[in-house]
C-alpha cells in the first residue's frame, strides 16, 4: 500500500481540477479594482496602471501577460521562492519599491482577488480599507 504525500497544484492545475479557466485577464482585474474606494485606472506609456492618489498598486506589462503589484519588500523573496514559476522579481529599477511581478497565466481568480485587495490595502488609508472590507 502506498501513501501519497500532499498534492501541490499550480494555478492551471487547480483550475482544471475545478473546471474553471485558469488565466486571469486584465478585464477581471479591472472589474475588481474599479470597485475599490479611491482606486482609479491610468494609462502611462502604453501600460495600464491602477492607483490610489499618485501611488501605483497594480501595473501591467504592455502585452498584459504580467502584473506588478504592491507587496512588502521584506516578504518578497519568500513569495518568489515559494512559487518561482508564478512570481518574479521586479525589474532592477523597481526593486527598491514594495513590488513583485506575477504571470497572469498562472493565477486563478481567487488568487488574483487576494493579490489585488492586499496591494490596494497597502496604499489606501487604513480606515478606508476597514470601511470597505470590514477588517
Regions found by a protein language model. Give the residues of each.
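Charge-dense, helix-prone N-terminal extensions
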Residues: 1-135
Amino acid at each position: 500500500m502506498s501513501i501519497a504525500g500532499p498534492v501541490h497544484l499550480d494555478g492551471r492545475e487547480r483550475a482544471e481540477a475545478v473546471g474553471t479557466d485558469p488565466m486571469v485577464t486584465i478585464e477581471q482585474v479591472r472589474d475588481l479594482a474599479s470597485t475599490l474606494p479611491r482606486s482609479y485606472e491610468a494609462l502611462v506609456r502604453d501600460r495600464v496602471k491602477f492607483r490610489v492618489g499618485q501611488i501605483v498598486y497594480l501595473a501591467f506589462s504592455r502585452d498584459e501577460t504580467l502584473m506588478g503589484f504592491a507587496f512588502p519588500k521584506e516578504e518578497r523573496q519568500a513569495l518568489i521562492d515559494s512559487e518561482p514559476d508564478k512570481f518574479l522579481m521586479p525589474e532592477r529599477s523597481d526593486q527598491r519599491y514594495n513590488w513583485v511581478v506575477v504571470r497572469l497565466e498562472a493565477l486563478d481568480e481567487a488568487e488574483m482577488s487576494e493579490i489585488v485587495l492586499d496591494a490596494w490595502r497597502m496604499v489606501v488609508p487604513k480606515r478606508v480599507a476597514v470601511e470597505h472590507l470590514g477588517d
